[in-house]
């Protein structure tokens, strides 16, 4: 698969043809780029014209990205519909308050509170999308300005914990894609943080460094995409567009593929070789009889052992830093010509490899290691002593670089003369491989990434989502953006020992990071092997180093909240920094996502629980300072408070139970016709708004529909669990939401690829949604039985019909959940429909039978009429809140 040629209609002022970069929201070659697209129009043309009319002044630096806004043809109706719907919701709430139901005031007040809450959350969600902006980087201008030696350094952080739950092959592919990316080898460094201190990861990284000596020059020579070998060899071959002859390319490709298969075999063998090596060693035991896990040279591994022992188990082990690949030097180094022992010709290829470092921070009992945030902060300090690049990229271990131009694209925003200095981070969307074709559990989450984040891009910038993000190092250190920084503030003022710890070598790197905007510093290149230097590196990742400092609070990634990503981005925005959103075609990065229902729900539980932790902490968006823009504050309030909707959603979904215990009394807002008219209007308008949003965001109806369905799935179970957990945490002092590593599975053949989709892992998280489904199925069956028995008045028929529509709609929204708990039977969706029909029929038959028995002896009790009011007071806005 060769590097894709530039799209014919790629966006850009200079008709540049940088391979791999096209309009963020349009397929390559689709419609002449963003500037000519009918939904997006340039927003910075006047600024560019003014810059061209310099009036004899020195020419201003060129703009490194273009800004586009939604055309007024779509944007004005979108805003108007939002305003009209807001007015309709206000009028509806006022009408409901005026027409009170005195027969069931307690339930009426609950429904009023629910409708008000849903109206507020819808407004919070919608307000941040009223000014969507997309920005398209110009790579050709970046190359002309900085490829002569001015490109800044980039440190890349990769995080992993378990080589089984997070397959090591994914992690090593991520590293290979980073080493091979289209960026000068002497200007970027890769750091693997192994929070499990596994010898398998360490030796796997050794194998990866060896294979990289072949893979990286091959990628540079033939300009292949993507540069993660697993994805590259799995993709369908595209026409070759590299500089070599096709025959040479295909010969090289066969050799590299064979070497890659051997590399994978060596990785797999580590899981048997390491235990066998340790078992075979004579006298291999510590004083307590535990067998040590041995490295290849026979010495005990300082990290975790296969047989846990004191100081060698999870949560208790020494810190480890190993430099796998040292600094390559600044001058290109050409490879060897083809020979009998080296069949690939690299004589015209720069074969240098970037710095590669293995890190396992120290862990000891009695210390809270702060999970991913703690690991990232340790990487931040270690990298400062070894490479100290001014910019940092972070990846999860299951993500890889899919577009080798991604680093350059992010720098277009960081180095632009308009807002570059005030930009703290550039966020890329998350895209995933091996998600089922219908995206049953909304893993792609396109409504959030392609609509909500584009909306925030027009305010202060998108939120940080945990991976695929470039940071400015000094912003993470807690510095203020230049526009908020006093003129007499020197970068050296950042280096306060009480704030950053007692390592003076580390503190001395902070001013250097603040001042190096265009060149990489490699202070450790000549001293990586010196004992004192490495001792200092080990010191900054000890457990006690952060005691009495601001790490995890005002410095680095934020601690004590499960969603450390969102709260860290919020801290930067609160200080006045901006962020930028960058989507590319082809996608900049791709990763894996949980396609099993239970794993996906646990992932959502961590997100929703962490959001509530943030809302009820001192990082609450409502308490932020004046530097946070009002609309950005609104967006963060929406991101952190949305799980509360579950309280009202569950009440609405369980109304049939309420009426079963309420003697069959039927209450609905009167006058009925006016109520239904309002209800239809407010729901219909949100559907129309959604259709307009689909147009400008480049979504599909399936994307939008899956978002609606999974919001209901989350609200009936996971969000409720998050709310209850936070309540218990406040009342009983429980710990925060427990971090559960989302297990990933290696993709197998066609039969195994989606095997996890059909596995049922029963968990308490499934129970609430199962109950909601059962209640609504029972309501439908009981209503059918009541219809057979007869005895309804016309008014009751109208009310029951409205209730049945609601019951059916709840089941339609929970359809993906129902498939998930059916396991392998979900391969035949018709079985689900047959099961639901049979369940409703069974309930109806039971209702009729009980009614007949009781009617034969005496009058039927009042509770048999409960089904007529199964959903008596319908929620007016029960599905107005989008996103999760």
UniProtKB/Swiss-Prot annotation:
Any one Pfam family match given in the protein's UniProt record, by short name: Cellulose_synt
Catalytic residue positions: 195, 565
GO MF terms held by the record: cellulose synthase (UDP-forming) activity
SUPFAM superfamilies (UniProt xref): Nucleotide-diphospho-sugar transferases (SSF53448)
Assigned EC number: 2.4.1.-
Biological processes per GO annotation: cell wall organization; cellulose biosynthetic process; plant-type primary cell wall biogenesis
Gene Ontology, cellular component aspect: Golgi membrane; plasma membrane
Compartments (UniProt record): Golgi apparatus membrane
EC category: transferase
Keyword Cell wall biogenesis/degradation: yes
Annotated transmembrane regions: 73-93, 104-124, 640-660, 672-692, 708-728, 765-785, 802-822, 830-850
UniProt KW keywords: Cell wall biogenesis/degradation, Glycosyltransferase, Golgi apparatus, Membrane, Transferase, Transmembrane, Transmembrane helix
Region (Disordered): 1-34
Binding annotation for substrate: 396, 398
Recorded superkingdom: Eukaryota
PANTHER family, per the entry: X-BOX TRANSCRIPTION FACTOR-RELATED
Function, in words: May catalyze both beta-1,3 and beta-1,4 glycosidic linkage on beta-D-glucan. Essential for (1,3;1,4)-beta-D-glucans synthesis in grasses and cereals (Poaceae). The mixed-linked glucans (which are not present in walls of dicotyledons or most other monocotyledonous plants) are particularly important constituents of the walls of the starchy endosperm and aleurone cells of cereal grains such as oats, wheat, rice and barley. They can account for up to 70% by weight of the wall.
Family in the record: Belongs to the glycosyltransferase 2 family. Plant cellulose synthase-like F subfamily.
Protein's name in the database: Probable mixed-linked glucan synthase 9
Organism: Oryza sativa subsp. japonica (Rice)
Originating gene: CSLF9
